[in-house]
Every structure is written in C-alpha cells, then in structure tokens.
From Swiss-Prot:
CDD domains (UniProt xref): PIPKc_PIP5KL1 (cd17304)
Name recorded for this polypeptide: Phosphatidylinositol 4-phosphate 5-kinase-like protein 1
Gene Ontology cellular component annotations, sorted alphabetically: cytoplasm; plasma membrane
Keywords from the named record: ATP-binding, Cytoplasm, Kinase, Lipid metabolism, Membrane, Nucleotide-binding, Transferase
Species: Bos taurus
Disordered: annotated span: 1-24
Described purpose of this protein according to its UniProt entry: May act as a scaffold to localize and regulate type I PI(4)P 5-kinases to specific compartments within the cell, where they generate PI(4,5)P2 for actin nucleation, signaling and scaffold protein recruitment and conversion to PI(3,4,5)P3.
C-alpha cells in the first residue's frame, strides 16, 4: 500500500515494560470471585498463551499498540482534523519489528468523542493480559482477536481494504458526527505490522459490538441473502461461541417494541451512506440477552439516560434530524437496544469491500452458478435495499 502524503514519520518506540509491571501488580490483587466470573464470561474463547501459533504476533501487536497509544497520550490532537491528520503515517521502530499507525490523530479524536480514555485503551490492548481468539465462521483468511476484557476487536485486513477504509475515512467521520447514534462499528485505529524485513500486515481495532458479553445467548451475522448463509450450530452442551447466519435465523424475530421505528430509520441512514461509498458485503451483527426484571423499562435512570442521549444536540429539531434515541444506561450503549424482554446488541461491520471490477465479475459468476437464489455479491444499491427489507421483515 502506498504511503499517503506527506509521508511517514519514523521514531523509536517507548517501552511498555513499566506499564506492564504496573498492570501485573494491579491484577495480582483481583479476588477469586472476579477470576471465576471472568472465566465464565470467556466460555468458548481461547487465551493466546505461550505455545499458541499466534502468540508471537500477539506480543508484537500488544507492545506496538501500547507505544502507539502513548504517542496520542503525550501529544493529544487539538482542533479539527486536517488533511495532514488523515494522511499521517507514523512508524515506530521496536526491537525486531515496526508498527505503523495510520491517521493516528483522527482516530485519537474519535476515541475521545466516544468518552474512551486513552489510559483505558492502552491498558486493554497492551501487554498486561493476553488477547482472546475465537473460531470465526467467516470465509475470509483474516485473523480475529479480542482484548482480554472483550471490549475491543482486532482484525487483520488486506492492503486494498485498508486503502478503501482510509479513502472513505473523512466521510465516515462526518457521518458519525451527523448521526452520533449510528449503527456503524466504531473503528478506533488502523495499523501496520512488519516483522524484521518481512511483508507488512495490516489490522484494525474496533469497539466490539458484542460487549459486555457475559449473558449473551445467541449471536448472528446477517447479510440478507441465502447462499452460504448457514452455520452448523454447536452441539448441545458445547462451549464454542459460534456466530450463526441468516438461514439459522429463520422463524425468529427481533422484538424491539417502541425502538423499532428508530432502528429501521437508522438502518436506512447507514445503508444509504454505505451505498454512496459504493460498498457492499457488510454485515448486521446481532446478539440477544434476556433482560432481568429490574432491567426492564427506563426506571430511575431515565433522567441520566435522557441527558446522555441528547448531549451535543443544539435543539430538539437537531436531535430528530440526527436520529438520536434514548441510550440505555450500559457500557457500549451505542450498540445496545432494549426491547420489552430482551437486550439486543446491533452493529454494522465489515465496511471495506468496494464494488469494483473484481466484485462485478464475481456477481456475474454467482448469477450463473446460483440461478434464482440470493447471494451477497450484488450492487451496493441492491445490497442496501435487501438488508433493510430483511430487517423490516424480521422486527416487531
């Protein structure tokens, strides 16, 4: 991938050793109850420990991300983002590897707008605790990681996907400013990793849609089509955490109650934006969690929720134009919608596939291969319309 102008900066990276010692000292004071609860919440996920095939890569990513976040802590961006911020490439040289941070000031501002403290971000992604791996049902060859607290999701990307993401980044940021309660997954960082003189590998950091995951009972990846959209469910009693697909959802509905109209409108706004970007093959992630009796209804937190939900809007009219809603009093509130009986985790992910020549040829081949059946490779307009129709048909 060609480095955007004005060209990369290269600096020696600070060491995360002091931060690792502090985090290890803090973690040593956690009690038995906390550790048991942590183990239960991670049922079906796998710690990337010594001996795991991805352990070395994980250690390099952790050390690199710790140092990269330290830069934004030492030099926090001010003012509005500039063209130079969007094109900045900062390369930090470590012993045996280099980690690049692309458009770092832009993502630092985005993290700050979400109320995410850089110290918390650094601690979660740094070397204090191992990442988690899960068995993905995706057909891509990407590697997937979760921070140990499952708050952040890391995924490897191809260079052309990174190019598309960075090309769309100014419009992505603008869309989130216009629609602060958008369902689009929040990308928090884009990085490259080069070991010794090897080839660069790219990865992104995102907020996990499925957080907090402790009581989630079902997970789905929805594209609104049928070809290759079935996953064999885990056997009864299995600890595997599987993300199921469209055909697994047949006969089910999402009961959002009064929130349904907001959800349908936000899907229209977000898919229209992705259509304008000429993007397709994105997914609606969904997960279910049954609400406890004391969690149903706004309750005593209504004033707090209302204040947080309208913060940043200048008027009721502006709030309506932005399609804001009453956010739940919960972590990761932007991706959580409460229905009468269930809490739903909802988000649009995988926003980097552009409808170019490669996808047009793939669409032609699939039309011949699967006559009369629906598949994911269609024009962005058709893709957006079909996914919105699926949502309307499966919500109440």
């Amino acid at each position: 991938m060609a480095a955007p102008s004005p060209g990369p900066r290269e600096i020696l990276a600070p060491s995360p050793e002091a931060g690792r010692r502090a985090a290890a000292s803090s973690s040593g004071h956690r009690g038995l109850l906390w550790r048991l609860r942590d183990k239960q919440c991670r049922l079906g996920l796998f710690e990337i420990g010594p001996g795991h095939e991805l352990h070395q890569v994980m250690c390099l990513m952790q050390a690199g991300l710790w140092a990269a976040t330290q830069v934004s802590m030492d030099h926090p961006p001010t003012g509005l983002p500039t063209e130079e911020d969007f094109s900045e490439v900062l390369t930090q040289v470590h012993e045996g590897f280099e980690l690049g941070t692309l458009a770092g000031p832009v993502f630092a501002r985005l993290r700050r707008s979400l109320g995410l403290a850089e110290e918390d971000y650094q601690a979660a992604l740094g070397p204090s605790r191992p990442y988690l791996q899960f068995l993905s049902t995706s057909k891509s060859k990407a590697s997937f990681f979760l921070s140990h607290d499952q708050r952040f999701f890391l995924k490897t990307l191809r260079s052309r996907e990174v190019q598309a993401l960075l090309a769309h980044l100014p419009r992505y940021v603008h869309h989130l400013q216009r629609h602060p309660h958008s369902l689009l997954a929040r990308v928090l960082g884009v990085h490259s990793l080069r070991v010794a003189r090897g080839k660069k590998k790219y990865f992104i950091v995102m907020q996990s849609v499925f957080y907090p995951a402790g009581r989630i009972s079902e997970r789905y990846d929805i594209k609104g089509c049928e070809v290759s959209r079935w996953v064999e469910p885990a056997p009864e009693g299995s600890v595997l955490v599987l993300v199921l697909k469209d055909l697994n959802f047949q006969g089910k509905t999402i009961n959002l109650g009064p929130q349904r109209s907001w959800f349908l409108r936000q899907m229209e706004l977000d898919t229209a934006f992705l259509r304008e970007l000429n993007v397709l093959d994105y997914s609606l992630l969904m997960a279910f969690q049954r609400l406890h009796e004391d969690e149903r209804g706004p309750g005593s937190s209504l004033i707090f929720r209302t204040a947080r939900s309208i913060r940043g809007a200048q008027s009721a009219e502006e709030s309506g134009a932005q399609n804001r809603r009453l956010l739940p009093d919960a972590p990761n509130a932007l991706h959580i919608v409460d229905g009468p009986e269930h809490r739903y985790f909802l988000g649009l992910v995988d926003l980097t596939t552009v409808y170019g020549l490669r996808k047009r040829l793939e669409q032609l081949w699939k039309t011949l291969r699967y006559p009369g059946r629906t598949f994911s490779t269609v024009s962005p307009a058709c893709y957006a319309r079909r996914l919105c129709q699926w949502v309307e048909a499966h919500t109440e």
